[in-house]
Structures are given as C-alpha cells and as structure tokens.
C-alpha cells in the first residue's frame, strides 16, 4: 500500500520549511518575553532557544519542547522517523537527555487511510526506541493536511545546560551535519532526484543529534543550537545577536551534501529559502546568490551548531571523534561588528 503513496503531494510545505518565517514570527511573539519573569524558568522564549528549561531543584531542570510538520518525504514510515528525530534534537541541543515523548498527529482521514497514519506513528516510535525513550501517548485531530511530530520531555543538569546566546568572542564554530537537506528534498518533491541521491537526505534526517548530550558536559562548549528551518545563517544570526557578537563563516569550510549545488543549478530551491533571507538578510554582509541559497536552505533535523572556546577545542574534537564525527571549524565568533554574520 505505502509504495504507491506520495505523502509530499498532500501538503503545501515540507518539513521545517513549513516554519513561519522569522520576520512574521517576531510579530507573533512580540511582548511574550514577559513570561520569563518566573525565576525557575531557566530558559524561556526570550532568546528563541531550542527548548524551555524549568528548574526541578537547584541543580536539575526539566527540558520541554515540541516540533511537528508536514511530510518532507513520501514514505510514511520515514516521515515518522524524520519528524521524531527532529523533535528529540531540541533536547540534545540544550545539552540534555530525553525522557519521554508524546505524539502529535493531524490527519486528513477522508483522504488518506488510517493505516498510513499508523505507519507514520510506527516510524516515530522506532526513533524513540533508538533514543531510549517511550512514546508515551499523544493527541490527534482531523486536519486538511498530514502533520506529525512530538512533544518531548527531557532533563538537564544546570551546569551542563547549553543555550544559543552564551557564546564568547574567540569561539570556533562547528556544524555536525552537512547542509542541503532542503535542496535535495525539494528535488525529490519535483521528481528530479537522481538515483544515486535517493535516501541521502533521509539518512541524515534520521540521524539523532545524541552527541549534544555529551557536548553539554564539556566546559569548552559555550553555546549550542540545532540548525533547522531558518537555515544555517538564521541560526547563526540568533547566536550572534543573542551573544552580542559577530559570526565570521568560511563558506568553503561549510559542509554540504555533495549534490546540493547541482540541484540548485536545476532550480530546486525550497520556498523557505528566500523567506529566510528576507527575514534576516539585512543583518548579513552581501553574498553571492549560490551562497545565499545554500546557507539559507531550510534544514529538517539538521546538525548541531556548536561554539567552542579555544582552550576546549582539543577535548571537544576528541569527544566528537569518539562519537564518530570528524569535524573541522567553519568559522569563529568575534567582537560585535555592524553586522551579525559575515561570510568569507
């Protein structure tokens, strides 16, 4: 049954490319920072961080996050896996460990069979098992387009908690997954994906950001976030602005999927790419079109963006290598200039 279904044809958006643009989100969230007055709320929405953290006691906090979206791939089981991997990532990005998840499902019951939704949930449950947590329940509604995701609860020690706005001048920047996921999934939706590229983006999207829990324990890691729908530049702007610094990025050093630029030449540009640039482009130094299209590419279940102090770099790279990650710096953070990000 599922082989004949193309889930991406039932939605107007795909994955984290469904996100409301940063510019519109600023209007929606204007004034909401007042919620941070609770002293037990260690991390709220003031910094647009990956998750909220609320104190359990003086040493530990509960981490809470939710993430859901429309299909980014056609296969129902893979859609569930990707959505779950993406949602759990926010816990890891805070330096925490996930405890349990609750499913969020919107389904066009008069258009797509219930058995297809069951496959989606099975994919989500599979990833929860890989993360060592239960899929403990959920909520579903009849919706015009398929939607799936998780609300995830985790725990973090305060001394290990990582934010996206605490980087320091001199920190080196690292990215744990290549860019181009939005580009390749757009090629798939347009039926232009070459045979040798089938499954490439999917496999990255289904890779848990579990290393974040280890990175959180490193004193040299000063800030961390995951790269999702706002693209690398969007999350760099958040980190740089929040930390009152400027990020300098070496374009040639940024990891990208091998065929990403080929598909850009074929016109496989996600709709969210230009919306992203329109939202934060004025805070970035001018850059060539191809760089803009790659660096603003909306990532679904993208990698961790990590700011590492020079004195902690050797330990960080050793831990990364132990976890199977061969990383190289993509740039650094310097004292604040007129712009948030410069691409070299």
Curated annotation (Swiss-Prot):
Cofactor: Mg(2+)
Gene Ontology BP annotations: selenocysteine biosynthetic process; tRNA seleno-modification
Details of cofactor binding: Binds 1 Mg(2+) ion per monomer.
Keywords: ATP-binding, Kinase, Magnesium, Metal-binding, Nucleotide-binding, Selenium, Transferase
Catalytic center residues: 16
Keyword Plastid tagged: no
Record's catalysed reaction(s): hydrogenselenide + ATP + H2O = selenophosphate + AMP + phosphate + 2 H(+)
GO molecular function: ATP binding; magnesium ion binding; selenide, water dikinase activity
Matching CDD domains: SelD
Entry's Gene Ontology cellular component terms: cytoplasm
Protein EC: 2.7.9.3
Site feature: Important for catalytic activity: 19
Pfam family, one: AIRS
UniProt binding sites for Mg(2+): 50, 90, 226
Binding site for ATP: 19, 47-49, 67, 90, 138-140
Family: Belongs to the selenophosphate synthase 1 family. Class I subfamily.
Protein name, per record: Selenide, water dikinase
Organism: Pseudomonas aeruginosa (strain ATCC 15692 / DSM 22644 / CIP 104116 / JCM 14847 / LMG 12228 / 1C / PRS 101 / PAO1)
Lineage of origin: Bacteria, Pseudomonadati, Pseudomonadota, Gammaproteobacteria, Pseudomonadales
């Amino acid at each position: 049954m599922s082989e004949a279904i193309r889930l991406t044809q039932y939605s107007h958006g795909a994955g984290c490319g469904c996100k409301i643009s940063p510019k519109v989100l600023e209007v929606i969230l204007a004034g909401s920072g007042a919620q941070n007055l609770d002293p037990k709320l260690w991390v709220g929405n003031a910094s647009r961080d990956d998750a909220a953290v609320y104190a359990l006691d003086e040493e530990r906090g509960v981490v809470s996050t939710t993430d859901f979206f429309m299909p980014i791939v056609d296969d129902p089981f893979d859609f569930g896996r990707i959505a779950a991997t993406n949602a759990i990532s926010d816990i890891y990005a805070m330096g925490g460990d996930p405890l349990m998840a609750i499913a969020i499902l919107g389904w066009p019951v008069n258009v797509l069979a219930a058995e297809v939704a069951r496959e989606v949930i099975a994919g989500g449950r599979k990833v929860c098992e890989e993360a060592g947590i239960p899929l403990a329940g959920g909520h579903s509604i009849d919706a015009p387009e398929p939607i799936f995701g998780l609300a995830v609860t985790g725990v973090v020690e305060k001394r290990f908690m990582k934010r996206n706005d605490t980087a320091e001048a001199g920190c080196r920047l690292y990215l744990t997954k290549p860019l181009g996921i939005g580009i390749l999934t757009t090629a798939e939706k347009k039926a232009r994906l070459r045979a040798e590229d089938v499954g490439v983006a999917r496999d990255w999207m289904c890779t848990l950001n579990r290393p974040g829990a280890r990175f959180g324990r490193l004193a040299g890691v000063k800030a961390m976030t995951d790269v999702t729908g706002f693209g690398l530049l969007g999350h760099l702007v958040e980190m740089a602005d929040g930390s009152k610094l400027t990020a300098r990025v070496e374009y040639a050093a940024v990891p990208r999927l091998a065929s990403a630029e080929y598909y850009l030449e074929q016109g496989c540009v996600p709709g969210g790419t230009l919306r992203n640039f329109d939202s934060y482009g004025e805070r970035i130094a001018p850059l060539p079109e191809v760089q803009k299209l790659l660096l603003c590419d909306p990532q679904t279940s993208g990698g961790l963006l990590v700011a590492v102090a020079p004195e902690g770099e050797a330990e960080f790279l050793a831990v990364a290598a132990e976890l199977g990650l061969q990383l190289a710096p993509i740039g650094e953070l310097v004292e604040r200039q007129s712009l948030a990000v410069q691409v070299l």
